[in-house]
């Protein structure tokens, strides 16, 4: 085999070579077809090789592809910032945008701006940004410090701040062994406890993914959770940052996932879907309330990247947003997401390794368990998630490996999040391959004794 000089995620693994993509499909150099059932890393939200996006890329390349942000602004970057500020749900907040290349950078920028917001008002001790366990906000040291993802933190723990402070709203595995609504949203009121312990004078902001992605396989909270979180933040003069890198730009059936709960954040991070994978691009959106002390003070955001506000990327993002709007993809994500969720929930009745199926829009998480009644996970040495992802890929379906389970990490789960352009007959095709995958894994790898021979009703 020819030596590869490319550092890949698993250094001893063989990866197929992608040759081209079309719509929801990717084709390798052996002409094998794959359904992009996860939009890559929940990124390729409008599918592959969309002509309108390619045309926008070419038009901008002929015009100008790079200027440095301290020397020029561009029409494309200005238009994109204005376009994002006009998202209906946040329009009244008059948000300004800081453009970067990745979600990790967007998180870092959000942290810096939140801290600077308080520094400009003479409150330098408000310099901690706290978060939740069972979360993932990025792989840079600052964003990883915020991430309650034990596996990704482990190698660098000596370099990281311990910023995750409260448990996630993980109703399938409630950390308090309670049930909603009798729990009285203890997962949210724990933020109050954490603030009292640390002191509000030391906390700049609280960050959360509206729907937890990689660390929890689409965990979303019970009703009233984010209302309570925002109430607590406002009470203690703490900014609320919503990490919408994975959930934003239509993925959940709303332009922004926070719209499901009607709670408007002070700062929002975006990525992935805002360029749909056609270019590296992310953004930190900052409300007028947060910007005002900086505008009245130093008048500079202490952050910067070489490719920030890149006009080529901005032009691509504008074309992606146009395409989403023209084809009503946010509404279609809601409609087709309900269909996908129903189809996948139907599988759980027949396969006992499926513990929970949860989702909003075209973002669905499937958590696997060794025992459907105790919810006990499989042992780590089984590497069940990797097996399921591998078998699905062999059958022509790409799905996203995620964490879940006890302590939000000792368990197995995947995310299914196809492009927003997927049609119902393509969903049927996706679900059929996933069904074949689970059937094979359960019967041949896990063992026949896991075949579901009694229904939940019989058990009860």
Over which residues does each language-model region extend?
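Conserved N-terminal phosphate-binding loop of PLP-dependent enzymes in the Aspartate aminotransferase
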Residues: 1-460
């Amino acid at each position: 085999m020819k030596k590869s000089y490319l550092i890949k995620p698993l250094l001893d693994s063989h990866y197929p070579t992608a040759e081209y993509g079309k719509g929801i499909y990717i084709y390798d150099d052996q002409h094998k077809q794959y359904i992009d059932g996860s939009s890559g890393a929940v990124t390729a939200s409008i599918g592959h090789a969309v002509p309108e996006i390619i045309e926008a890329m070419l038009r901008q390349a002929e015009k100008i592809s790079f200027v440095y942000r301290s020397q020029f602004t561009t029409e494309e970057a200005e238009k994109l910032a204005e376009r994002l500020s006009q998202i209906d749900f946040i329009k009244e907040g008059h948000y300004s945008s800081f453009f970067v290349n990745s979600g990790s950078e967007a998180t870092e920028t959000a942290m810096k701006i939140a801290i600077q917001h308080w520094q400009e008002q003479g409150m330098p001790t408000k310099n901690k940004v706290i978060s939740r366990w069972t979360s993932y906000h990025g792989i840079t040291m600052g964003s990883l410090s915020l991430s309650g993802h034990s596996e990704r933190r482990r190698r660098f723990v000596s370099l990281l701040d311990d910023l995750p402070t409260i448990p996630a709203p993980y109703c399938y595995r409630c950390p308090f062994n309670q049930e909603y609504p009798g729990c009285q949203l203890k997962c949210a009121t724990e933020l109050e406890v954490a603030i009292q312990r640390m002191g509000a004078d030391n906390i700049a902001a609280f960050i959360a993914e509206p729907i937890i992605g990689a660390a929890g396989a689409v965990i979303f909270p019970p009703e009233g959770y984010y209302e309570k979180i925002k109430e607590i933040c406002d009470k203690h003069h703490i900014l609320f940052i919503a990490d919408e890198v994975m959930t934003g730009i239509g993925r959940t059936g709303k332009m922004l996932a926070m719209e499901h709960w009607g709670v408007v954040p002070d700062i929002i991070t975006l990525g992935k879907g805002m360029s749909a994978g056609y270019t590296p691009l992310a953004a930190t959106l900052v409300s007028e309330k947060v910007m005002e002390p900086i505008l009245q003070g130093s008048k500079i955001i202490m952050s910067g990247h070489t490719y920030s506000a890149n006009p080529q990327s901005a032009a691509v993002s504008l074309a992606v947003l146009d395409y989403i709007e023209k084809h009503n993809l946010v509404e279609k994500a809601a409609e087709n997401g309900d269909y996908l969720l129903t189809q996948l929930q139907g599988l759980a009745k027949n396969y006992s390794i499926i513990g929970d199926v949860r989702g909003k829009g075209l973002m669905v998480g499937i958590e696997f368990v060794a025992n459907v009644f105790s919810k006990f996970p499989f042992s780590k040495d089984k590497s069940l998630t990797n097996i399921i992802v591998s078998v699905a890929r062999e059958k022509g379906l790409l799905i996203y490996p995620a964490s879940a389970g006890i302590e939000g990490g000792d368990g197995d789960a995947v995310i299914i999040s196809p492009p927003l352009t997927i049609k119902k007959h393509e969903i049927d095709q996706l679900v059929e391959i996933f069904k074949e995958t689970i059937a094979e894994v359960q019967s041949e790898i896990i063992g026949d004794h896991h075949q579901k021979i009694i229904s939940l009703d019989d058990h009860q």
